[in-house]
Amino acid sequence: MPVITLPDGSKREFAHSVSTLDVAADIGPGLAKACIAGRVNGELKDACDLIETDSDLSIITAKDEEGVEILRHSCAHLLGHAIKQLFPETKMAIGPVIDNGFYYDIDLDHKLTQEDIDALEKRMAELAKTNYAVDKRVVSWQEARDTFESRGEVYKMAILDENIPKDSTPALYHHEEYIDMCRGPHVPNMKFCQNFKLMSVAGAYWRGNSDNKMLQRVYGTAWADKKALKVHLNRLEEAAKRDHRKIGKQLDLYHMQEEAPGMVFWHNDGWSLFLELEKFIRQKLGQYTYQEVKGPLMMDRVLWERSGHWDKYSEAMFTTSSENREYAVKPMNCPGHVQIFNQGLKSYRDLPLRMAEFGCCHRNEPSGSLHGLMRVRGFTQDDAHIFCTEEQVQQEVSACIKMVYDTYETFGFNSIVVKLSTRPEKRIGDDEMWDRAEEALKQALKANDIEFEILPGEGAFYGPKIEFTLHDCLDRAWQCGTVQLDYALPGRLGATYVAEDNSRQTPVMIHRAILGSLERFLGILIEEYAGKFPAWLSPVQVVVMNITDKQSDYVDEVVNLFKEHGIRATKDLRNEKIGFKIREHTLRRVPYLLVVGDQEMENKEVAVRTREGVDLGKMQIEEFATKLKNQISLRSLNLLED
């Protein structure tokens, strides 16, 4: 006679074993109709699974985030069902849930086309509309293997052979004639899987190993209702318009090419953005009292062995040799900064020592993972390392947090998710050290009134860390900033200071990054602003255009005056209609479009309009220059208003 305790504390007693669906029906027909699964004593279970003992139960519906994840997983099975109907020769591999959707990896000799994807989506819709029930059957390992062997499903057999113990009882989910294997849970009925769309197809190696066969990966998205699906598709459409690769080409900011995969060729305007971003961070470094240093691009293998990178990171490092010595191109700056710290005797009075570098780093990322500016092989880190005593950790971390928030706010990023990763199972140091380290990070976050989520066991082996994830205008998450405590590297590389009692002590090292990679952050900014950069950041801040040749000398005079004020100005003296010029520079997202005719020339004025088409009227040259300089100095996100 199980007693079921619901989230509101109420209890229901049953005379026999019950399922989540039974409990939902006992509460009411509406809940039974909406029930997708249950969380029984903290564990997700299928709606049909029997509860035999007293238990806590939460009923999962499509209104719950977990419910949406479950229906997405079931949509992957629905996709498998459709694939096997249209392409019976297909061998099914894996079909997991991902952010906002799902995918299925399949082995099919026929290369899927867009027409095939459309046909699969249509068949999925036809199947889902029948509202067929999903039948879960728990079987022996051997029965599961026999089932897939009889169907020639070699990948399912491999999963059983390599990943599932022979004494286990796998769950097989029957979608009419289609059978799939999964931990579950899944929806009890396909009525929950009505709002989906297949998005794309790509290549993927079996088990992610390039030595294995290349499979086809079909991606899809699924949501609880039509409205949510439409919102997501609209967001994707907007994201496609904002794609930094597309805008980068339109605005002539940079390019990539096959001869240098994952390396950026910055063009004039793109490099202007890069330098302005670097200048901004450099000013922050001065404000927060950092030294700026520059380490070598390559260092001997011996140093990387001492730091531990050679053992744990060598696959991602580019190497070269000369005169019988092996070198590695640096994937990160920290070992070099310890070498600078080690030059000369350091006292406790020298701490904290804050050392920053715009470090040019290289990592041998897999070619298939490269993506414009977002995932590159050559990148510049706004990296810093703070050498301090353990007593100084909290105040230094607190200053880092302030710096992160100051920086993000300048760019208009105000939605920041913060996570604190704590001690992993395998770690250096004793529990007392970790207690102090984690508490210091918690107190620093609390001192700044920062809400944060704790990720147990997700810290590095050498110390806990804070991660800052910003959300852009499309609510996409970008993990950029980190503050990481390191109790290992300084000791490995011989960093010491003379303590107040004249003993030699090892400093604590704080790894700190705000933007992460300048290249990636610029990619984020291009998409956040859709190429319409704030005036302070814009490669060209002002374009001055003449109406006829008579104003050419005056245009030169205006542009030169702006340049004397430090304003990035250019001119357009082409023999084109002024409307054509305005349209062209509007498309190039220049913040301010200035037009001069005979009257403006006579009165030493300019007619000012913004790229948004706002007419600011006529202004004296110095008046406009002063207003713009003030806006630039404040790093305002907005343009001047009428």
Curated annotation (Swiss-Prot):
Under InterPro entries, the record lists: aa-tRNA-synt_IIb, aa-tRNA-synth_II, aa-tRNA-synth_II/BPL/LPL, Anticodon-bd, Anticodon-bd_dom_sf, Beta-grasp_dom_sf, TGS, TGS-like
Gene3D superfamilies per the UniProt record, alphabetical: 3.10.20.30, 3.30.54.20, Anticodon-binding domain, Bira Bifunctional Protein, Domain 2, Threonyl-trna Synthetase, Chain A, domain 2
Keyword DNA repair tagged: no
Required co-factors: Zn(2+)
Q: Which reaction does it catalyse?
A: tRNA(Thr) + L-threonine + ATP = L-threonyl-tRNA(Thr) + AMP + diphosphate + H(+)
Which cellular compartments is it found in? Cytoplasm
A family per Pfam: tRNA_SAD
UniProt KW keywords: Aminoacyl-tRNA synthetase, ATP-binding, Cytoplasm, Ligase, Metal-binding, Nucleotide-binding, Protein biosynthesis, RNA-binding, tRNA-binding, Zinc
Q: Where is the TGS domain?
A: 1-61
Task: Please list the GO biological process terms of this entry.
Answer: threonyl-tRNA aminoacylation
Q: State one molecular function term (GO).
A: metal ion binding
User: Its Enzyme Commission number?
Assistant: 6.1.1.3
Cofactor, how bound (note): Binds 1 zinc ion per subunit.
Subunit-level organization:
Homodimer.
- Give the protein family: Belongs to the class-II aminoacyl-tRNA synthetase family.
Its job: Catalyzes the attachment of threonine to tRNA(Thr) in a two-step reaction: L-threonine is first activated by ATP to form Thr-AMP and then transferred to the acceptor end of tRNA(Thr). Also edits incorrectly charged L-seryl-tRNA(Thr).
* Stated name of the protein: Threonine--tRNA ligase
Q: Which gene encodes it?
A: thrS
